[in-house]
Curated annotation (Swiss-Prot):
Protein name: Transcription elongation factor SPT4
Positions carrying N-acetylalanine: A2
Residues where Zn(2+) binds: C16, C19, C33, C36
Any single Gene Ontology cellular-component annotation: DSIF complex
Similarity annotation: Belongs to the SPT4 family.
Subunit structure: Interacts with SUPT5H to form DSIF. DSIF interacts with the positive transcription elongation factor b complex (P-TEFb complex), which is composed of CDK9 and cyclin-T (CCNT1 or CCNT2). DSIF interacts with RNA polymerase II, and this interaction is reduced by phosphorylation of the C-terminal domain (CTD) of POLR2A by P-TEFb. DSIF also interacts with the NELF complex, which is composed of NELFA, NELFB, NELFD and NELFE, and this interaction occurs following prior binding of DSIF to RNA polymerase II.
Species: Pongo abelii
Length: 117
């Protein structure tokens, strides 16, 4: 796991609404999302960081080898980069972003375990 992926502080943590990666708000703005930046373009765009991440999430998992872990398969992060992931993320991506993802062939499934989609 790359050190820059690990949250640098326990305050101002946010989780990506698409992949559930957890970072500080500044890390998302500076580096974007390691898994989703090709689609969400959060890097350098604080407004997109607020739209595409949530400060409300439950549990965290540090994933070192996502391809080898049954937990990563259960959490649907086995194809993502090593990092810290939320178990459940409250919220949904804005409809415009969901439509854009669909037009690019990316299926969006909410990471909020309270909502069944």
């Amino acid at each position: 796991m790359a050190l820059e992926t690990v949250p640098k502080d326990l305050r101002h943590l946010r989780a990506c609404l698409l992949c559930s990666l957890v970072k500080t708000i500044d890390q998302f703005e500076y580096d974007g999302c390691d898994n989703c930046d090709a689609y969400l373009q959060m890097k350098g765009n604080r407004e997109m960081v607020y739209d595409c991440t949530s400060s409300s999430f439950d549990g965290i998992i540090a994933m070192m080898s996502p391809g080898d872990s049954w937990v990563s398969k259960w959490q649907r992060v086995s194809n993502f980069k090593p990092g810290v992931y939320a178990v459940s993320v409250t919220g949904r991506l804005p409809q415009g972003i969901v439509r854009e993802l669909k037009s690019r062939g990316v299926a969006y499934k909410s990471r909020d375990t309270a909502i069944k989609t």
